[in-house]
Amino acid sequence: HANQLVQTIRANLTKSLERAGVTILRGQGRLEGAQRVGLREPSGVDRVLNAKDVIIATGSDPFVPPGIETDGRTVFTSDEAINLEWLPRWIAIIGSGYIGLEFADVYTALGCEVTMIEAMDKVMPTFDPDIAKIAGRHLIDSRDIDARSGLLARKVTPGCPVQIELADFNSRELVETLEVDAVLVATGRVPSSKGLNLESLGIETNRGFLPIDDTMRVLVN
């Protein structure tokens, strides 16, 4: 049902763009100059397009910390979770940001046992304290989620079961090894800016983020 819904939305958006006069090209894009974009089509054919302005809107990718191995089935990111074809009885969610909270809400509603693992000394560490208190009461406490803070998932090994080495965040000493049916890695997202040939234009990123001015123009060295 979810896949069908996504296909319908994608088709409707495509039609809306085409009605607005937008030309849609499919392939892998890269910068070839200040007003030039290279495109590698699915067939392997390379093209170069000229444009007055170029907007970089490549989105983001899930961040997977060192030590965590994903296989897309028993250990997976939020991108892969929406296409998961099975329901784990017990799932550990690494990270307690908005993505982790959303999926914890979904999995508990589906009857899964959920353990939430947060490296910081409290869950939802980046939230406003008042919002975190309300969210914790409604999304964690009321759902009987086992939320653990101050623990670093220093190693995650896919399998049946998945093994998680939990270490004290400060000392890095092993606390316990947890065995669960699945692990969702929800430790944030990073800019999807690799492979755009930014360096050829003198654009230096900061952890993947593009430098911009007050009008959102990319800064070039």
What do these predicted ranges mean?
Residues D53-T77:
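Extended, non-globular alpha-helical segments
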Residues G29, V37, V48-G59, I93-I94, ...:
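Short hydrophobic core segments
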Residues D71-L87, L178-N221:
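FAD-site-proximal beta/loop scaffold in flavoenzymes
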Residues H1-A51, A147, R154-Q163, L178, ...:
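Feature captures the FAD/FMN-dependent oxidoreductase FAD-binding
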